[in-house]
Regions:
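C-terminal beta-strand-loop-alpha-helix "lid" module of Rossmann-like NAD(P)-dependent dehydrogenases
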Residues: 1-291
């Protein structure tokens, strides 16, 4: 059995660790709730934006709208955006996203380009031999609309070249506080069938006039949509990451509680043994006439 001092030191270390894990649990809970609010607000914006885009698509025939973002049949490779966290201690959150990304990348044989958002995922991808051509950090800790706009401009710029014909985003979709799952979503090109389940707004019979042209108007909507979509991805990923970290820290705190209980019992036993040994030594000394 360890000495009383050794057990005390071990117990103190575990108690300090518990304070840290519990603080991280509380912080992750707060950040998760904040991210969930942003997800809800941004979802309303995206729904309105998609409804407007559907209004345009529903009132134009295929040959009336020759937009470069709609059902483009050009050849080329694909762009994959992989969204993970900047920090660890969040269970299997990052590894699940990277695993899905690797699976999707293996389906392409024409050298797709990878863009990483998140330090953890960037390192995991490089460890697996996938080197991102662009990397952004800070999206998980401080997701902003400005960063979403920067990423959107880069993605649209790549898509409009002759080298790429598809853009995919791999991230963790937030369903609820109990359910989050890694998902790969095609962002570009936009297909008419993508808007079948979107509820239209306004007068469905009214004639729309587009100035300066329908393509210019739709172009602007696409830029706003891609920016809004990436911001939504940031928020869903942030909520999912903080739930994963919250669960990991809660589990760590519970394990610390169990260890503290075990060490406290061990400390009491060590103290009793120490007292017993001291009494035995005193008794032996009395019998031998040492006292």
């Amino acid at each position: 059995m360890s000495s009383v001092n050794e057990i005390k030191q071990h117990l103190k270390a575990v108690e300090q660790t518990r304070q840290i894990t519990n603080a991280m649990y509380l912080l992750s809970t707060s950040r998760m709730k904040k991210a969930m609010q942003h997800v809800e607000f941004n979802l309303f914006y995206l729904q309105r934006l998609r409804a407007t885009m559907k209004d345009i698509l529903s009132k134009t025939k295929n040959n009336d709208l020759t937009n470069r973002f709609i059902e483009d049949n050009k050849k080329g490779s694909a762009v994959f955006v992989v969204v993970t966290s900047d920090k660890g201690l969040c269970g299997g959150y990052n590894s699940a996203v990277v695993k899905l990304a690797i699976e999707k990348l293996s389906e392409y044989h024409d050298y797709p380009v990878v863009i990483s958002l998140g330090i953890a995922g960037d390192k995991m991808l490089r460890d697996k031999g996938v080197v991102p051509v662009y990397s952004w950090y800070g999206a998980s800790q401080h997701p902003t609309l400005n960063l979403a706009n920067q990423v959107a401009e880069k993605l649209i710029g790549l898509y409009l070249t002759d080298d790429f014909h598809e853009v995919y985003v791999v991230y963790t979709e937030f369903h609820s506080a109990a359910v989050q799952e890694p998902k790969c979503v095609r962002l570009l090109p936009l297909l008419r069938r993508d808007f079948l389940d979107v509820e239209r707004e306004g007068d469905k019979t009214a004639e729309m006039i587009f100035e300066p042209s329908i393509d210019v108007v739709f172009d602007q909507l696409v830029y706003q949509y891609v920016t809004g979509f990436m911001f939504d991805v940031f928020m869903q990923s942030s909520a999912s990451e903080n739930i994963a970290r919250m669960n990991a820290m809660q589990s760590a705190t519970r394990n610390a509680d169990d260890m503290i209980k075990h060490l406290s019992t061990e400390l009491n036993a060590a103290r009793q043994l120490q007292i017993t040994n001291e009494i035995t030594e005193i008794s032996a000394a009395v019998e031998m006439g040492g006292i």
